[in-house]
């Protein structure tokens, strides 16, 4: 979930 605009992807980047 790094180059995806999915909610879990964003959560991974933020977390």
UniProtKB/Swiss-Prot annotation:
Chain segments annotated as transmembrane: none
Record's keyword annotation contains Transcription: no
Keywords of the record, alphabetical order, are: Hydrolase, Protease, Secreted, Serine protease
Per annotation, the relation between temperature and activity is: Optimum temperature is 45 degrees Celsius.
Main subcellular localisation: secreted
Coiled-coil stretches noted in the UniProt entry, renumbered to this chain: none
Q: Name one GO cellular component term.
A: extracellular region
Q: Name one GO molecular function term.
A: serine-type peptidase activity
Per the UniProt annotation, how does pH influence activity?
A: Optimum pH is 9. Activity is relatively stable between pH 8-10 but drops at lower pH and is absent at pH 4.
Tagged with keyword Hydrolase: yes
Enzyme class, broadest EC rank = hydrolase
- Regulation of catalytic or functional activity: Inhibited by serine protease inhibitors phenylmethanesulphonylfluoride (PMSF) and di-iodopropylfluorophosphate (DFP).
EC number(s): the record gives 3.4.21.-
**What is the annotated role of this protein in its UniProt record?**
Protease capable of hydrolyzing gelatin and cell surface heparan sulfate proteoglycans (HSPGs) in vitro.
Family per record: Belongs to the peptidase S8 family.
Q: How does it assemble?
A: Monomer.
Name by which UniProt lists this protein: Alkaline serine protease
């Amino acid at each position: 979930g790094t180059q995806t605009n999915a909610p879990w992807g964003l959560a991974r980047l933020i977390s």
